[in-house]
Amino acid sequence: MEIEAVEKEAIEKLSKISNVQELESFRIEFLGKKGKITGLMKNLKNLPPEERPAYGKRVNELREKIEKLFEEKRQQIQRILEQEKMEKMRIDVTVPGARRKLGHSHPVLKVMEEIERIFVSMGFDVVEGPEIETTWHNFDALNTPEWHPARDEHDSFYITDDLLLRTHTSPVQIRTMLERKPPIAIISPGKVYRRDYDATHLPMFHQVEGLHVDRDLSVAHLKFTLEEFARRMFGEGAKVRLRPSFFPFTEPSFEVDVYLSGYGWLEILGAGMVDPNVFLNVGYDPEEWTGYAFGMGVERIAMLKYGITDIREFVRNDVRFLSSY
């Protein structure tokens, strides 16, 4: 009988199938719309009416049987494929794991933290303040006259007539003196802003400024502090010299140079004795208190420490550069 022949052929072929492609070909050949089992139903029209029910039932039973065997074979092949995949993904727990890439400290941050550690070890407190300042804190209280070029819009970033991005961290010293009674010894690290951009200047850079107020302080105390800083930052061979200069908030004022082997004398910061007018602006009696102040650009110190010639390298986000320090 034709039904038995199709059944035998289907079971025999199904038993030999070993992959998904062969299984799909089998499905089309026997279970598809034009497959052999569907073709058996076309014989109904050639049978006597009384035989058709039994024949149709037999064909449907065959389809159900082959579909069941087909599904079992599909699951069998699926299990084999999953097992093969697991074998390929087998983990050798004895193999050393891949090292995770960790972040790297920016050279400016490293130098700023080193500066802070040096001055903290010398008894200075670290104090921070707002980056948006009033003109009074940024200029007036620091004895900066109206005609001074630093107050010009071409040099500073003004937000309103009375507010600007601070041009130095000295306003932190003003705020601290208004809040505390002397003696005080502080450093104020942070970002500052000026309208300048070239190989040695950035519109946003970092400063650390220091202030020490006590009775009977002199230039000798200032020089000792800066010599100690230079020695710890640049090594035992570092020497310091003071050159006369002018800053509105100190009198006398100095440019400070450091001598480094292989480089000679290099300017690193500005300093001086606090001007009596600054003390008067914060309510300190200049007849009783004296003080010295200093300020340095962190990028400048980093350039000297690491031999960097272009300050713009610090903001170019070149991983090769950043990971070198």
Curated annotation (Swiss-Prot):
Residues annotated for Mg(2+) binding in this entry: 251
GO biological process: phenylalanyl-tRNA aminoacylation
SUPFAM superfamilies given in the database record: Class II aaRS and biotin synthetases, tRNA-binding arm
Pfam families (UniProt xref): Phe_tRNA-synt_N, tRNA-synt_2d
GO molecular function list: ATP binding; magnesium ion binding; phenylalanine-tRNA ligase activity; tRNA binding
Required cofactor(s): Mg(2+)
One GO CC annotation: cytoplasm
Cellular compartments annotated: Cytoplasm
Matching Gene3D superfamilies: Bira Bifunctional Protein, Domain 2
Leading EC class: ligase
Acyltransferase among keywords: no
Sorted UniProt keywords: Aminoacyl-tRNA synthetase, ATP-binding, Cytoplasm, Ligase, Magnesium, Metal-binding, Nucleotide-binding, Protein biosynthesis
Annotated EC: 6.1.1.20
PANTHER family the record matches: PHENYLALANINE--TRNA LIGASE, MITOCHONDRIAL, PHENYLALANYL-TRNA SYNTHETASE
Subunit structure of this chain's protein: Tetramer of two alpha and two beta subunits.
Name by which UniProt lists this protein: Phenylalanine--tRNA ligase alpha subunit
Biological source species: Thermotoga petrophila (strain ATCC BAA-488 / DSM 13995 / JCM 10881 / RKU-1)
Gene behind this protein: pheS
